[in-house]
């Protein structure tokens, strides 16, 4: 504590040189050197003399080298003039001035940047507000258009309903693209015809009146028709057994007779009539009488081909053929 107080007093002493002040400051920072230097600081002549320098050199302290200073002309004493002290002070002032200028410039730049950021933020806000206003306007336009379309659609639908109310007939559901008045009328007529035919079939088929539904009615009608077919087949078989008849192939018999007879040209009725009329014209009859209805000629009297194939039944072989056919029928029936 005593060393620190002494250092403060020495620093505040007005007649001290710069070196003395530096040494006192060193003493203040390193109080361990208080005891050996107390005698030297007690006498000011020793401080100004060379004993202090020699003692510091023996102690291993070289203050001028520590503070970056040099001696003048090899003298052990330090030569520090007031001009050098003033130069260092001016340098510090200049450095402080430059630092203050840099700080001011930085502050100005910061303020400018802040102003720019504020302006950019305001511009962005204005753009966003403009976009929002534009979007709101577009939304309003879309809503207005939608309202107009709804009104138009409602008007069209009201017109369509009025037109439908004017029609007297019942509209029938049709396919896409065919929902017209003519189509609906034709469909109604077709269904009416179908319903009439179904009623007629119900009257024909016994027990079909009790069935409800078109599918059931159709099934019942089909079953009834099938039963009728079976009954007809059974009755035809009974008739064939009771009244047997020869089963001849008339086409084969006629072909055989034609093949056996010689090829002769049979004049057609038209040829006969044309030749007869020609002869009558030459004999003195007028053409009007020939073409008129005075002549009544039956062409079937001249050419009779329908009775010729049946001439085979007049032979004596007919009963034997009948007996053989009857026996074949009985054999097939298992009698």
From Swiss-Prot:
What's the main place this protein lives? nucleus
**Which terms in the Gene Ontology molecular function aspect does this entry carry?**
DNA binding; DNA-binding transcription factor activity; protein dimerization activity
Q: What induces it?
A: Accumulates strongly in response to blue light due to reduced preventing 26S proteasome-mediated degradation in an ADO1/ZTL and ADO2/LKP2 dependent manner, but levels decrease in the absence of blue light via 26S proteasome degradation (at protein level).
Q: In which tissues is it expressed?
A: Expressed constitutively in roots, leaves, and stems.
What does this protein's UniProt record list under function?
Answer: Transcription factor that binds DNA to G box 5'-CACGTG-3' and, to a lower extent, to E-box 5'-CANNTG-3' in vitro. Binds to chromatin DNA of the FT gene and promotes its expression, and thus triggers flowering in response to blue light.
Cite the Pfam families for this sequence: HLH
Return the PROSITE patterns for the record: BHLH
- InterPro entries according to UniProt: bHLH_dom, bHLH_ZIP_TF, HLH_DNA-bd_sf
**SUPFAM superfamilies linked to this entry:** HLH, helix-loop-helix DNA-binding domain
Record's subunit section: Homodimer. Interacts with IBH1. Binds reversibly to CRY2 after blue light illumination.
Superkingdom of the organism of origin: Eukaryota
Q: Where found in the cell?
A: Nucleus
Cross-referenced PANTHER family, in alphabetical order? STEROL REGULATORY ELEMENT-BINDING PROTEIN (PTHR12565), TRANSCRIPTION FACTOR BHLH63 (PTHR12565:SF467)
Recorded hits in SMART domains, A to Z, give:
HLH (SM00353)
**Taxonomic lineage of this organism?**
Eukaryota, Viridiplantae, Streptophyta, Embryophyta, Tracheophyta
Q: Which residues form the bHLH domain?
A: 178-228
Q: Where is this region: Disordered?
A: 110-160
**Which keywords belong to this entry?**
Activator, DNA-binding, Flowering, Nucleus, Transcription, Transcription regulation
Q: Which GO terms describe its cellular component?
A: nucleus
The protein's name is Transcription factor bHLH63
Single biological process term from Gene Ontology: DNA-templated transcription
Keyword Nucleus set for record = yes
The parts of the chain that form a coiled coil are none
Its biotech or industrial use comes down to: The blue light-mediated interaction between CRY2 and BHLH63/CIB1 is used to design an optogenetic control of target proteins or organelles.
């Amino acid at each position: 504590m005593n060393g620190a107080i002494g250092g403060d007093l020495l620093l505040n002493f007005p007649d001290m040189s710069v070196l003395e002040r530096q040494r006192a400051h060193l003493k203040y920072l390193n109080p361990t050197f208080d005891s050996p230097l107390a005698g030297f600081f007690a006498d000011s002549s020793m401080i100004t003399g060379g004993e202090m320098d020699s003692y510091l050199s023996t102690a291993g302290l070289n203050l001028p080298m520590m503070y970056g200073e040099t001696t003048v002309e090899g003298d052990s004493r330090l030569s520090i003039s007031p001009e050098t002290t003033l130069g260092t002070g001016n340098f510090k002032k200049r450095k402080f001035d430059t630092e203050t200028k840099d700080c001011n410039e930085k502050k100005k730049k910061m303020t400018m940047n802040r102003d720019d950021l504020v302006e950019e933020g305001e511009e962005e806000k204005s753009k966003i507000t403009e976009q929002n206003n534009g979007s709101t306007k577009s939304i309003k336009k879309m809503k207005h258009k939608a309202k107009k379309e709804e009104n138009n659609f409602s008007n069209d639908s009201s017109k369509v309903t009025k037109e439908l109310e004017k029609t007297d007939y019942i509209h029938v559901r049709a396919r896409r693209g065919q929902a017209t008045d003519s189509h609906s009328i034709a469909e109604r007529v077709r269904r009416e015809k179908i319903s009439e035919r179904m009623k007629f079939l119900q009257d024909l088929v016994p027990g079909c009146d009790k069935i409800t539904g078109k599918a059931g009615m159709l099934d019942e009608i089909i079953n009834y028709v099938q039963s009728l077919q079976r009954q007809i087949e059974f009755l035809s078989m009974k008739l064939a057994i009771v009244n047997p008849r020869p089963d001849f192939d008339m086409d084969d018999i006629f072909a055989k007779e034609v093949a056996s007879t010689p090829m002769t040209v049979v004049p057609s009725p038209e040829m006969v009539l044309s030749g007869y009329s020609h002869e009558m014209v030459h004999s003195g009859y007028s053409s009007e009488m020939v073409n008129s209805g005075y002549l009544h000629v039956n062409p079937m009297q001249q050419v009779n081909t329908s009775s010729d194939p049946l001439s085979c039944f007049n032979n004596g072989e007919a009963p034997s053929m009948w007996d053989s056919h009857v026996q074949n029928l009985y054999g097939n029936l298992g009698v």
